[in-house]
């Protein structure tokens, strides 16, 4: 039986091979820490599963109500009342389950912060540390967002003839989602309370607004696509699970890379020089 030979690299790894920009760092992390990102995705799936199941059963009920309406078992008034009640109760349940989803997001935030900062990671220890540090802020941000999303749905459903839901959703996409994403990362990096994080996120959003807006539009595009598939609840649930495991960690990592670039430019260089360029290779003459 032949002995397996260990393959060695043709040359030693040099510090100069480390990424020098946040863009390079993103692909460096994806290539070398994919297993960590995958494990993060599995935790996100586990804690987001109640939300996924809520959407699944909502879609099932919507299909059932529509079939009764088409068959004549339910008149238009009862159909609209049932759909509105389903929307209200579904939104309330989603708000409640954000407390579960916050557990994974808080822990994963710590993991991603460490990856981008170039810090060593012990996954479970860092995950627990992230939950301890970030859970309250993550809960509050998701709670506020869920309330605002529920209000948008309410306005869209009850004032549909005035098209008031459209400006509400536009405001959510243009301002609320980008600011809340930035606030989540700001609170994780600088370990401040959520209100301080939101205040600073509002100030920092506009210099880099187009990048965060693109990230927000990405979320909006996914939700819009899933909305058009709501007549296929099982397919929607499977897609959501795949998104949680494979896409969401990559998305959040990209968000961290963009945010660290912003922090380096507008905060770290002057106020937190010890954080400036963390995780990147910098020649000695630049460090001095």
Task: List each language-model region with its residue ranges.
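Membrane-interfacial helix-loop-helix connectors in multipass membrane proteins
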Residues: 155-168, 232-239
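Histidine/lysine/aspartate-rich catalytic loop segments that bind and position anionic ligands
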Residues: 165-187
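Loop-to-helix entry region at the N-terminal start of transmembrane alpha-helices
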Residues: 87-94, 162-173
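Helix-coil boundary and N-terminal low-complexity module in membrane systems
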Residues: 1-153, 181, 186-227, 236-239, ...
